[in-house]
Structures are given as structure tokens and as C-alpha cells.
């Protein structure tokens, strides 16, 4: 069902403790006091702890009627003069398409809430693809993304929108997403790249497209096949023009998540980029912007 048809029919990983993550003077951002930094960090950790607790609940405990469901808005757009439609990533229901009636009206309780990267609790009704959003509450404020980290966050959102089907829960995806946002916040360029590569690898694995060596283990170099797996390339082999290969050491580091060496990080970017492109019908918009900035 297309989005327009839906609208017509509608009318993990554990999180560290606060003590382990408390920032010291070296982590202080310009213009921020130690007390202010600690308050922001503790608020963020409280949100992440709540998400972690809820994520640990068995899937069988998922309520039939969603209420106060932890969620992040991936994308929202106007639907009419007074309403919005939005895609949200939720903890237990996966990616959900929501109609927020009257959300643009000055007196609406939803006004200003449906923005990316803000942790929310959402309540909705409906059995069709387009659900009716009835309530939204802020869970709290996470440290904001800005600059190139913000663009990286939009890239993460676009990956989820393009690779994840609506209402497919994908256990572990919500925690993976939250971890990516946390890792992008305040990170230097090199750490942002590592965070993006980890998210790409985790997302491909959750979708059943994990990049792995399927043939030619121990070969000196590897190539990515159109099936999304890596195959060994014998020394002296002649390949078609444009086929990219990577040394065994780099491939081993990438698959093991060892991205400290610049060569391994570069190989991870190239391998996961190609693996994702195999699953897309058209290029990613945010990747094009980030590529112009030479960070993706």
C-alpha cells in the first residue's frame, strides 16, 4: 500500500551507568558549566536507562493497544493546513506511519513535538497502515545534534526509512538507533564515522543482510558480490573494470568491528556503502550531502 492509499484509508546492547558516563572537565563543551553538563548528561542517561528497561521486556508483553510507546520521529511533513503525517521508530512496534490531526493548530497538544531526535512517548489508534496519533509526550531532552552530526543523524533516519518496512518490529533496532544518536552527540569527525559504520553494520545484520565472507576464505583480497557477500579474489585474477577489492587484513578488521586504523575505517565505509546501495532503488539524499562534505 502506498502512503497516499494509507492516508485515504485512515481518513540490544546494554547502556552504561551514570557513574561510568559522568563527564569530567575534559569533556566540557564550550560555554557550558560543569553543573550544566552533568545535568544534561544525567537527563540523557535517565532516558536511555528507561529505554533499556523497556527494551528488555519480552516481546509477548507488547500491548495490543499502543500507549506511551517510546519512539523517535524519523520524518514528518504537512498533510493538510492543520495536520501532519510522520514516520516514527518505536520500541516494540517498529516503524509506524502516523497521522497527527490538528498538530499544526496553535492550541494543539501535539504542536512542536513531532521533530526528529527528541525522545517521545506516543499513543495511537487504528488497525490500518496509517494510525491516528492521539497523544505525544516528551520523555526528556537529549543533548542536541548540530552541524555535521545533525546531518549524520538525518542519514541514520533515512537508512531506517529506506531499509525497514513499516510495522516490522526488528528486535534490537530501537536500541541500535538510540546508541547511534548517543555516539553522534558531541563526537569528533573520526568518531562520527565509526558510529555510522557501526550503525550500518548493525542495520544490515538486523535486516538479514549481514556482510560476511561466503567464499574464498584466506584469499589475499576480497570483492563484494551483487548478493551482498564478500568473495575472495585470487592473486593475479583479472576482474571487470570498476570492481573494487580490499586487502584481507582490512576486511578482517571491518568484519570484526576493529575500525581504529584509517585503512580499516575507509574500507568499512566503502564496503557498507556498496552493500546498502544493493538494497536501494535510488540513491540516499543525505549521503549525497555528506559526500559533498567529504565525511561519508
What spans do the regions from the language model cover?
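Non-catalytic alpha-helical scaffolds and adjoining flexible linkers that form interface surfaces
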Residues: 2-21, 25-85, 89-296
Amino acid at each position: 500500500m502506498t502512503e497516499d492509499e494509507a492516508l485515504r484509508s485512515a481518513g540490544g546492547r546494554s547502556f552504561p551507568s551514570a557513574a561510568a558516563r559522568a563527564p569530567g572537565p575534559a569533556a566540557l563543551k564550550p560555554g557550558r558549566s560543569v553543573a550544566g553538563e552533568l545535568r544534561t548528561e544525567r537527563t540523557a542517561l535517565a532516558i536511555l536507562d528507561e529505554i533499556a528497561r523497556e527494551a528488555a521486556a519480552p516481546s509477548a508483553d507488547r500491548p495490543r493497544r499502543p500507549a506511551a510507546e517510546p519512539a523517535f520521529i524519523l520524518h514528518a511533513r504537512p498533510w493538510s493546513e492543520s495536520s501532519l503525517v510522520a514516520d516514527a521508530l518505536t520500541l516494540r512496534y517498529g516503524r509506524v506511519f502516523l497521522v497527527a490531526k490538528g498538530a499544526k493548530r496553535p492550541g494543539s497538544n501535539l504542536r512542536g513535538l513531532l521533530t526528529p531526535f527528541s525522545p517521545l512517548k506516543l499513543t495511537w489508534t487504528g488497525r490500518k497502515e496509517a494510525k491516528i496519533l492521539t497523544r505525544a509526550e516528551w520523555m526528556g531532552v537529549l543533548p542536541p545534534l548540530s552541524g555535521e552530526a545533525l546531518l549524520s543523524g538525518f542519514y541514520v533516519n533515512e537508512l531506517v526509512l529506506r531499509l525497514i518496512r513499516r510495522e516490522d518490529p526488528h528486535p534490537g533496532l530501537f536500541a541500535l538507533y538510540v546508541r547511534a544518536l548517543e555516539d553522534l552527540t558531541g563526537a569528533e569527525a573520526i568518531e562520527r564515522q565509526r558510529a555510522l559504520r557501526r550503525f550500518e553494520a548493525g542495520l544490515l545484520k538486523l535486516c538479514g543482510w549481514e556482510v560476511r565472507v561466503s567464499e574464498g576464505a584466506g584469499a589475499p583480497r576480497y570483492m563484494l558480490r551483487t548478493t551482498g557477500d564478500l568473495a575472495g579474489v585470487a592473486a593475479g585474477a583479472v576482474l571487470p573494470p570498476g570492481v573494487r577489492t580490499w586487502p584481507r587484513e582490512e576486511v578482517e578488521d571491518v568484519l570484526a568491528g576493529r575500525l581504529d586504523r584509517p585503512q580499516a575505517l575507509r574500507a568499512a565505509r566503502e564496503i557498507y556503502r556498496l552493500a546498502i546501495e544493493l538494497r536501494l532503488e535510488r540513491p540516499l539524499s543525505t549521503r549525497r550531502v555528506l559526500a559533498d562534505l567529504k565525511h561519508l
